[in-house]
Amino acid sequence: MRPDGRKNDELRPIKIEKNFIKNADGSVLIELGNTRVICTASIENKVPPFLKDQKKGWITAEYGMLPRSTPVRMLRESTSGRVGGRTHEIQRLIGRTLRAVVDLEKLGERTIWIDCDVIEADGGTRTASITGGYIALVEAVKKAMNAGMITENPIKDSIAAISVGIVLGEPRLDLCYAEDSQAEVDMNIVMTGSGKFIEIQGTAEIYPFSKENLLQLLSLAEKGIREIIRVINNLD
């Protein structure tokens, strides 16, 4: 029995509220169960120095957690004066997965910043950030196209992400924190709406896993991501 009574192949309830931050070019509040993340997209009419005069854009991300997004208050990373290794890894993950579905030349010499702020953490914050970041990106691009800043839609495909793992010997979809903290195997999967993989992060936390286990987890993730993509496609 899972902590919240779900079946092993069942997602947590998903809620998505677009235009959550009025000042942003695109924004969303995404909820998967008790995990809640605010994602915004901001367009700048400049690119990093390494892309100067290359006539293409860039997408980058920042990720953070509120001090009381966790049961015990955590320190803000700004207090320590540096970004931690986990945060840096997640920021790079969000940026590169979103770039995989964007034609950067059609974006023009612009940078889109994706900011993901976790306001409540109960497992799957990085995957929720990727999915929410994609929705915020789409909204920002729509706004830019309506304003005539971008003439062609640079987004080539939809994207979503989910966690899977083996807990107490059972493959499970969309792990909450209680499951994630005791998982024997933990994976984060990112896929496109057309069914292609962008990222597969998998780790044996306790025991090595077999090829059969891997295929079971990939199949679970694919099922969950298809369901999330359907939710995204049905948004107003």
From Swiss-Prot:
PANTHER family with a match to the protein in the record: EXOSOME COMPLEX COMPONENT (PTHR11953), EXOSOME COMPLEX COMPONENT RRP41 (PTHR11953:SF0)
InterPro entries noted in UniProt: ExoRNase_PH_dom1 (IPR001247), ExoRNase_PH_dom2 (IPR015847), ExoRNase_PH_dom2_sf (IPR036345), PNPase/RNase_PH_dom_sf (IPR027408), Ribosomal_Su5_D2-typ_SF (IPR020568), RNase_PH (IPR050080), RNase_PH_bac-type (IPR002381)
Described function: Phosphorolytic 3'-5' exoribonuclease that plays an important role in tRNA 3'-end maturation. Removes nucleotide residues following the 3'-CCA terminus of tRNAs; can also add nucleotides to the ends of RNA molecules by using nucleoside diphosphates as substrates, but this may not be physiologically important. Probably plays a role in initiation of 16S rRNA degradation (leading to ribosome degradation) during starvation.
Catalytic activity field: tRNA(n+1) + phosphate = tRNA(n) + a ribonucleoside 5'-diphosphate
EC number: 2.7.7.56
Catalytic class of the enzyme: transferase
Protein name (database record): Ribonuclease PH
Molecular function (Gene Ontology), one example: RNA binding
Gene designation: rph
Domain of life of the source: Bacteria
Family membership: Belongs to the RNase PH family.
Gene Ontology BP term (one): rRNA processing
Record organism: Thermodesulfovibrio yellowstonii (strain ATCC 51303 / DSM 11347 / YP87)
Quaternary organization: Homohexameric ring arranged as a trimer of dimers.
Keyword Flavoprotein: no
Pfam families in UniProt: RNase_PH, RNase_PH_C
Keywords: Nucleotidyltransferase, RNA-binding, rRNA processing, Transferase, tRNA processing, tRNA-binding
Record-listed phosphate binding positions: R86, G124, T125, R126
Position of the signal peptide: none
